[in-house]
Swiss-Prot record:
It is found in: Membrane; Cell projection, Cilium. The chain crosses the membrane at residues 2-22, 35-55, 68-88, 102-122. This is Transmembrane protein 80. It is a multi-pass membrane protein. It comes from the Eukaryota. PANTHER family: GEO07735P1-RELATED-RELATED, TRANSMEMBRANE PROTEIN 80. Keywords: Cell projection, Membrane, Transmembrane, Transmembrane helix. Its main location: membrane. InterPro entries: Uncharacterised_TM-17 (IPR019184). Pfam families: Transmemb_17. GO terms for cellular component: ciliary transition zone; membrane.
Amino acid sequence: MLFHLSGLYSALYFLATLLMIVYKSQVFSYPCNCLALDLVLLLLMGILKVAQLYLGTKGNLMEAEVPLAASLAFTAVGGLLSVHFLLWQTLVLWMDSVLSTVLLVLHGLEAGLQVVVIADFIR
């Protein structure tokens, strides 16, 4: 259930963040190199999220530790990218903070449950 909620929220987050980056580039003086970096990191975050959800679902259905461990690693990297969009982005709007905080909470819940499930599968 959490994977479905996370996947749905990540799609919303990706779209909202993309629109906010476009907005910031039009309204504010946003450096081009920072704009390109933010767009590349957002695209990387989307690709990692798809891989994380696929491996997490596959590992959960097969009760296999390796896909879940890979999904946990992708969750950690996704959390770091969320921190980037929360704190280290060139311009951080209030909505960026809210969306990234909710995404970090979801990453934390996913990571905690993945650790518990991996420990259960190893036993």
